[in-house]
C-alpha cells in the first residue's frame, strides 16, 4: 500500500497543475478525493478578456521573396519622331558617271600665223556707223549727226540721230562734241539708251571759246533699243564737213 502511494503521488501532483495549489502534497484528501470539492478559480490560467479583444486577429510576418517576372505586355503605339541626328562622316567615292553627249562645235581658232580666220568674221554681223554734226545745236535736244560716213547695216538714222538695235549683242559707242562758247557758258552732252543716261561729258568755257565733251561706253542691247546723244544745256558746234562733233558705234559680238 505504501509502495502504491509512493508511485501515485507524483503522478497526481503533475496532473492537478495549478488548480490544486491549495492542497498539500501527501495528504489523504489529495490521494483519496482528488476530484472532490469546488476548485477555486485560477487567475493565472484564465486570460484577461480585454487583452484578448485588443489583440489583432493576425500578426504580419516577414517580407517574402520577390516573385517571378510576369509575361510581356502588348506592344504599345509608335512614339513621336525624334530630332535629326548629327551628320555622318562622308561616304566613299562613287563610281564615275557615264560619258556625256558631245558638245556643239567651238568657234574657229587662230590660223598658223596667229590671226583670226575669215570664218570668224563671217559669223559676226556687219553693223557699224560713223557720222558728223553739220549744223549747230543748243539747249536740250537730241543731236542729229547728219553727215554720215559709214552706216553698215543701216541701223543709224541721221534724221533722228538715233541708232536702233536689231541684233542683240554687245556694242561699243563713242562721241565727241565741240562746245560753241564765247559767252562764259558750259555744255553737257549725254549718251542715252532708251531715255536713260549711260555716259555724260561736260565742256566748260573758261578762257577759251571752244572745248570738247567726249565719252565712250560698252552696252548690251536688245532688239528695239535706241542709243543717241542728247544735249543737257549749252551749245554744240557743227562744222559743215569738218566733223568737229562726231558719233560712232559698232557691234563687238552678237548673242
From Swiss-Prot:
SMART domains in the cross-refs:
C1Q (SM00110)
Tissue-specific expression: Highly expressed in adipose tissue, with expression levels at least 2 orders of magnitude higher than in other tissues, including brain and kidney.
GO molecular function, a single term: identical protein binding
Question: Where's the Collagen-like domain?
Answer: 61-111
Domain of life according to the entry = Eukaryota
BP GO terms, sorted: neurotransmitter receptor localization to postsynaptic specialization membrane; postsynaptic density assembly; regulation of synapse organization
Q: Name one GO cellular component term.
A: glutamatergic synapse
UniProt entry tagged with the keyword Signal: yes
Q: What is its main location?
A: secreted
Domain (C1q) spans 122-255
Q: Which PROSITE patterns match?
A: C1Q (PS50871)
InterPro entries recorded: C1q_dom, Cerebellin_Synaptic_Org, Collagen, Tumour_necrosis_fac-like_dom
Name the residue ranges with Pro residues bias: 75-89
Q: Where is the signal peptide?
A: 1-20
The record's listing under Pfam families reads: C1q (PF00386), Collagen (PF01391)
Q: Where in the cell is it found?
A: Secreted
* Keywords carried by this UniProt record: Collagen, Secreted, Signal
Enumerate the residue ranges of region (Disordered): 39-109
Secreted found in the keyword field: yes
Q: How does it assemble?
A: Forms homooligomers. Interacts with ADGRB3. Interacts with C1QL2 and C1QL4, when proteins are coexpressed; this interaction does not occur after secretion.
Known role: May regulate the number of excitatory synapses that are formed on hippocampus neurons. Has no effect on inhibitory synapses. Plays a role in glucose homeostasis. Via AMPK signaling pathway, stimulates glucose uptake in adipocytes, myotubes and hepatocytes and enhances insulin-stimulated glucose uptake. In a hepatoma cell line, reduces the expression of gluconeogenic enzymes G6PC1 and PCK1 and hence decreases de novo glucose production.
**Protein name, UniProt field:** Complement C1q-like protein 3
| Organism listed in the record | Homo sapiens (Human)
